[in-house]
Amino acid sequence: MIWHVQNENFILDSTRIFMKAFHLLLFDGSFIFPECILIFGLILLLMIDLTSDQKDIPWLYFISSTSFVMSITALLFRWREEPMISFSGNFQTNNFNEIFQFLILLCSTLCIPLSVEYIECTEMAITEFLLFILTATLGGMFLCGANDLITIFVALECFSLCSYLLSGYTKKDIRSNEATMKYLLMGGASSSILVYGFSWLYGSSGGEIELQEIVNGLINTQMYNSPGISIALIFITVGIGFKLSLAPFHQWTPDVYEGSPTPVVAFLSVTSKVAALALATRIFDIPFYFSSNEWHLLLEILAILSMIFGNLIAITQTSMKRMLAYSSIGQIGYVIIGIIVGDSNGGYASMITYMLFYIAMNLGTFACIILFGLRTGTDNIRDYAGLYTKDPFLALSLALCLLSLGGLPPLAGFFGKLYLFWCGWQAGLYFLVSIGLLTSVLSIYYYLKIIKLLMTGRNQEITPHMRNYRISPLRSNNSIELSMIVCVIASTILGISMNPIIAIAQDTLFSF
C-alpha cells in the first residue's frame, strides 16, 4: 500500500515537471527560435549519418550551413524587438545579445567551407566534426543570452567541452593530443575559478542567481562594497581572463593553436572570444556595477600586459599558427578598451565593430594558412618564402589579411582600431590608448616581415616545400578559396563603408 502511494506521488510529480517544461517550451520557445534551428540541424545530422552511406556527405555540409544561415535569418527578423526575459528569468533576448549571437553564427558559417577539403584530405570523421561545431555554436549562443549564473555556467561548459573535443580531433597526432590535454586542464581550472567567484557573488547577494536580482540582493544586504565582492571580482576576472587568453593567463593558447587542426583553430580563435566578451560585458556591467573602478583597473592591467607580451613574443615565432596565437592575445587587449569605455562613449559599439572586422581578417588569414598547409604540409614561416612566384593569388590574399590585422590604411583593421582607440581617448584612457598605438605599430613589423618573405624570397631562402609547391590556377572551385575571397573582400572594403556598421552597433539597446 505504501509502495502504491509512493508510486502515485512519483507519477504526479513527474507529470507536473513534464507539464511545466512543456509549458515553458510552448510559450517561451519562440525566444530561442534561432537556437532551436541549430538543435533541429543537430538531430537531422544524426539521423542522416545513421541511415545513409558515405555518398551523402555533401548533405551533411549542406544541412550544417543551412542551419547557420536560417539561424542568422531568424535573428535578423527578430531585430529591434522589445527586450524580453524568458524561461523563468534564465534567458534574456535583446539587440545587444543578438549582435554577439550574430557574430558567432557568422564565424561558424564561414568555418564550414574552410573545413571541407581539410577533412577530406586528413580523412577525419565528418559527422562528429560538424556535430561539435554546431553544439559549440549553440553553447556560445546560449551564453550570450544567459541571464543567471547557472545558465551561464552550463552554456559555457557546453561550449568548452566541444572546444576540447575539436582540439583533439586528430587523435593520431601527438601535438593535437598534447594541445587537448593542456586545453582541458587549463580550461577546467579556469571554469573552477570562475564558479568559485560565482559562489561569492551568490552568497553576498543573499542567494540570488539572476544577474539583476544579484544587484538588488547586494543593495538589500549592504554587501556591494564588501570584501566578498572584491574576492568574487578577482576570481571571475581571472576565469574570464583564461577564456579570453588575456596575459598572464594565455599560456595554453600557443600550444592549442599549434597542435589543433587549423579549421578548428580558425573557429575557436573567434567564437571563443566573442562568447567570452558577451559574458564579460554582462557580468562586469550588471553584478559589479558598484565596483566599476575596481574592474576597470583590473581590465586595464590585463589589457596592457596582453598588448605588450602578445606582440613582443609574436616577433620571435617561427610557426605561423603560433604567431597568430600571440597576435590574438594582443588583439584581445585592444578589444578590452571597448569594455572599459562602456556604453556611454561608444565603447561597446567600437568593440562590436572591431570584432566584425576581426572575423574577416582572422578567418581570411587562416583560410590562406589552410590552403598553404594542404599544398605543402607545413606552417613554418620560412617555408612561405617566394610564395608570390608560385601562387600570386594566395600570396596577395594573405598579405592583405595580415596588413589588415596590422591596422594599415585603407583596410578594415585600420578603421576598426582607429574607432576603438578614438573611443578610448574620448573616455580619458590616454595611457591605455598610447600603449595600444605603440604595440599596434610593433605588430606591423612582424606582419611586414612575413609579407616581405612572401613577395621577395631569394633563391637561397626558398625551402624544398616551396620548390615542390603545386601551382594552382588563379581561382579554383574549392570551398576554402571561396571563404578566403569573401574574407579578403570584407577585410578590404568594410572599413571604407563602416558608418552603417557603427550606426547599427550604436543602435543596440543595452537593456537588461
UniProtKB/Swiss-Prot annotation:
InterPro entries: NADH-Q_OxRdtase_suN/2, ND/Mrp_TM, Ndh2_N
UniProt signal peptide: none
GO cellular component: chloroplast thylakoid membrane
Translocase listed as a keyword: yes
EC number(s) per entry: 7.1.1.-
Topology with respect to the bilayer: Multi-pass membrane protein
Entry's localization field: Plastid, Chloroplast thylakoid membrane
Transmembrane segment boundaries: 31-51, 57-77, 99-119, 124-144, 149-169, 183-203, 229-249, 261-281, 295-315, 323-343, 354-374, 395-415, 418-438, 484-504
Catalytic reactions of this protein: a plastoquinone + NADH + (n+1) H(+)(in) = a plastoquinol + NAD(+) + n H(+)(out); a plastoquinone + NADPH + (n+1) H(+)(in) = a plastoquinol + NADP(+) + n H(+)(out)
Keywords carried by this UniProt record: Chloroplast, Membrane, NAD, NADP, Plastid, Plastoquinone, Quinone, Thylakoid, Translocase, Transmembrane, Transmembrane helix, Transport
Biological process (GO), any one: ATP synthesis coupled electron transport
Pfam families reported in the protein's UniProt record: Ndh2_N (PF19530), Proton_antipo_M (PF00361)
GO molecular function, one term: NADH dehydrogenase (ubiquinone) activity
Function per UniProt: NDH shuttles electrons from NAD(P)H:plastoquinone, via FMN and iron-sulfur (Fe-S) centers, to quinones in the photosynthetic chain and possibly in a chloroplast respiratory chain. The immediate electron acceptor for the enzyme in this species is believed to be plastoquinone. Couples the redox reaction to proton translocation, and thus conserves the redox energy in a proton gradient.
Family recorded in the similarity comment: Belongs to the complex I subunit 2 family.
Quaternary data: NDH is composed of at least 16 different subunits, 5 of which are encoded in the nucleus.
Protein name: NAD(P)H-quinone oxidoreductase subunit 2 A, chloroplastic
Organism in which the protein naturally occurs: Arabidopsis thaliana (Mouse-ear cress)
